[in-house]
Amino acid sequence: MTQFTGHAPIVVGTDGSDVSGLALRFALHEAQLRNTSLRAICAYDFTASRASSFGWLTVPDSYDLDTQIRDATYEAIARAVEEAMQELGGAPVEVEIKVEPGRPSQVLLDASADACLLVVGSRGSGAWGRLTLGSTSTEVVHHAHLPVVVVPSRTPVTPS
């Protein structure tokens, strides 16, 4: 049985990428240390109706692609959370998973209104990417009303 003390939750942005997996593990560990819950958020800014309006996709009215995408994403996040919890071990953490449409940075900021900490990954690709944050993490850092942790991608060390 998961113990939950009622403290403000930690919010983590997750999108299935390796970097968001690192952010998820960091957030889970932090939730264990703080004896609080975790809210895993996957935000997306793409829907079948939006794609259809641009002519990219034709979906019959009877086929609810948006619901199927949301459900599949929810299941993928649930698996990632379970794997991360097993990998970390330690105290169980109550986890709420949300898959929400909208601009990722705004969805994360809205989801963190009652949180104590917001955790996001930094995609960092290539030499230039390692020096910059992704657009979502940059927006979140600049507009958040609470502490934000940006978890960097792991960069392999290669001998010179």
What would you call each of these model-derived segments?
Residues 42-75, 156-160:
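Acidic, proline/glycine-rich short linear motifs
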Residues 40, 97-99, 150:
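A structural preference for short, hydrophobic beta-strand core positions in alpha/beta folds
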Residues 1-6, 19, 33, 82-118, ...:
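Structural beta-alpha unit
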Residues 25, 29, 109, 129, ...:
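Alpha-helical segments flanking ligand/cofactor-binding loops in enzyme cores
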Residues 26, 72-83, 107:
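Short, solvent-exposed amphipathic alpha-helices that sit
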Residues 42, 122-123, 152-153:
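Short secondary-structure boundary segments
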Residues 117-142, 157-160:
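Glycine-rich, Arg-bearing micro-motifs that act as flexible, cationic patches
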Residues 2-60, 111:
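Small/aliphatic-rich secondary-structure junction motif
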